[in-house]
Amino acid sequence: MSSLPKRTTLDKINILTTVGYPRPHLGGSLIAHPCERYLVYSFRWAYMPKIESKLNRIFRLGDAIEDIIIKDLKRAGITHGGSQTRVSGYRGHAGGSVDGIVEEVPEYPDETLLFEAKSMNHNNFLDVKRKGVKVSKPIYYGQMQIYMGKLDLDKAMFVSLDKNTSDLYIEFVHFDEYEYEHLIDREEDIIEAKHINEFPRISNNPSWFNCKFCDAKEVCHSGITPEK
């Protein structure tokens, strides 16, 4: 009788580092997502997001890179604090954590700025550098607007690191009151939604790029009943 194959080290790592749990709130890092229907599904726990082992490592690598960026900022004489400061949104059902608050920035030595760090692949890095974060990564831009508005800050220091080359890109993002108010209204609309049909699909084609890789695809396009 042949024995069952034993799990390898990689098998065990992949099993133990795969996690899945819903967010307890509507995240500030998602509020500028292009699909409002997705945000309703996410807030209402209509699906169980699953973070595979590889993606989990990518997230943890991002945390490690953020620490490296912060150390470099401090070497440049910039004061960093307030890491993971929480901000709260509509009736406590929305919110998020900032990467920090910085002061003594050479470009704005007398001001206090929001700090947000992101690591990305080479193509995304070049796109952000060429177009600016507002156009290239509107979700990041919206995240910073929410945090600046909640913390009463006029500017954000956005730092991106190219994971292929380790190059840095720094951009200063100014507070946009119109965008902030729009996102605050969006928070309320998502949280107070009574029926998913209040929000049309971003596309009726499940193979469209944003839908194809969406965690809520089965619930949204196939009509599968949520687990709970």
Where are these regions (language model features)?
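Short, solvent-exposed loop/turn elements at beta->coil junctions and helix N-caps
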Residues: 84-91
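Short connector loops/turns at beta-strand edges and beta->alpha or beta->beta junctions
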Residues: 44-46, 118-123, 161-165
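Short glycine-enriched, charge-decorated loop/helix-capping segments at active-site entrances
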Residues: 55, 129-135
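Conserved catalytic cores of phosphodiester-cleaving nucleases, focusing on short active-site segments
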Residues: 35, 69, 73, 96-131, ...
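Short secondary-structure junctions
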Residues: 73-81
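Metal-dependent nuclease catalytic regions and adjoining charged, substrate-binding loops involved
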Residues: 134-137, 141, 146-228
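Charged, glycine-rich intrinsically disordered N-terminal tails and low-complexity linkers that flank
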Residues: 1-68, 76, 207-210
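Cys/His-rich finger/ribbon microdomains and the adjacent scaffold used
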Residues: 2-3, 53, 96, 224-228
